[in-house]
Curated annotation (Swiss-Prot):
<keyword id="KW-0233">DNA recombination</keyword>
<dbReference type="InterPro" id="IPR023627">
    <property type="entry name" value="Rcmb_RecR"/>
</dbReference>
<keyword id="KW-0862">Zinc</keyword>
<dbReference type="InterPro" id="IPR000093">
    <property type="entry name" value="DNA_Rcmb_RecR"/>
</dbReference>
<dbReference type="GO" id="GO:0008270">
    <property type="term" value="F:zinc ion binding"/>
</dbReference>
<dbReference type="InterPro" id="IPR015967">
    <property type="entry name" value="Rcmb_RecR_Znf"/>
</dbReference>
<dbReference type="InterPro" id="IPR034137">
    <property type="entry name" value="TOPRIM_RecR"/>
</dbReference>
<feature type="domain" description="Toprim">
    <location>
        <begin position="81"/>
        <end position="176"/>
    </location>
</feature>
<comment type="function">
    <text>May play a role in DNA repair. It seems to be involved in an RecBC-independent recombinational process of DNA repair. It may act with RecF and RecO.</text>
</comment>
<keyword id="KW-0234">DNA repair</keyword>
<protein>
    <recommendedName>
        <fullName>Recombination protein RecR</fullName>
    </recommendedName>
</protein>
<comment type="similarity">
    <text>Belongs to the RecR family.</text>
</comment>
<dbReference type="InterPro" id="IPR006171">
    <property type="entry name" value="TOPRIM_dom"/>
</dbReference>
<dbReference type="GO" id="GO:0003677">
    <property type="term" value="F:DNA binding"/>
</dbReference>
<dbReference type="Pfam" id="PF21176">
    <property type="entry name" value="RecR_HhH"/>
</dbReference>
<keyword id="KW-0479">Metal-binding</keyword>
<dbReference type="Pfam" id="PF13662">
    <property type="entry name" value="Toprim_4"/>
</dbReference>
Length: 200
């Protein structure tokens, strides 16, 4: 039996979400149509509004409806002298939830990957360079992912910072809280040893 073309279209479009395959998309579509039509309509309105109104902050490149985001507009953060460089906007939310950072951000929207044609310009390093020249940061904290590409990106940015005599650091990577040593991979364990701190 052939399904409704509109239903097939809905299922196909739900598959654009990360981790959503054909079966998950079908379950979502049937759930919205059978049990939660008002939720589906609210979702459609929220998506339409977000897609048309949310852009990027002109300073940090995070998502915002304004020219500059709330973090960049915060005078306390403007005077902190701290800049944290992250790969994706979602990384800002993760860091903000810790409550441990009170500076400003710069979002790369990816990482260096020459094989994929992603060089310094594609991830906005020309814009970062401009900020390093025009603003007075005393420390840049690199919060790129602990991958080969993340490491290469961090090293490239670290060299940029050194050229401007700006202190540069990288967030530590290691064993998760509650993790057991026997289940941790060798690379993570190595980073844990290299990033060890003295106990006072």
């Amino acid at each position: 039996m052939q399904s409704s073309p509109l239903l097939e279209h809905l299922i196909e479009n739900l598959r654009c979400l990360p981790g959503v395959g054909p079966k998950s998309a079908q379950r979502m579509a049937y759930h919205l149509l059978q049990r939660n039509r008002s939720g589906g309509m609210n979702l459609a309105r929220a998506l339409t509004e977000a897609m048309s109104k949310i852009g990027h902050c002109s300073q940090c490149r995070d998502f915002t409806e304004e020219d500059t985001c709330n973090i960049c507009n915060n005078p306390r953060r403007q005077n902190s002298g701290l800049l944290c460089v992250v790969e994706m906007p979602a990384d800002i939310q993760a860091i903000e939830q810790t409550g441990q950072f009170s500076g400003r951000y710069f979002v790369l929207m990816g990482h260096l990957s020459p094989l994929d044609g992603i060089g310094p310009r594609e991830i906005g390093l020309d814009l970062l360079q401009k900020r390093l020249v025009e603003e007075s940061f005393h420390e840049v904290i690199l919060a790129t992912n602990p991958t080969v590409e993340g490491d290469a990106t961090a090293n490239y940015i670290a060299e940029m910072c050194r050229q401007h005599n700006i202190k540069v650091s990288r967030i530590a990577h290691g064993i998760p809280v509650g993790g057991e040593l026997e289940t941790v991979d060798g690379t993570t364990l190595t980073h844990s040893f290299l990033g060890r701190r003295q106990i006072d």
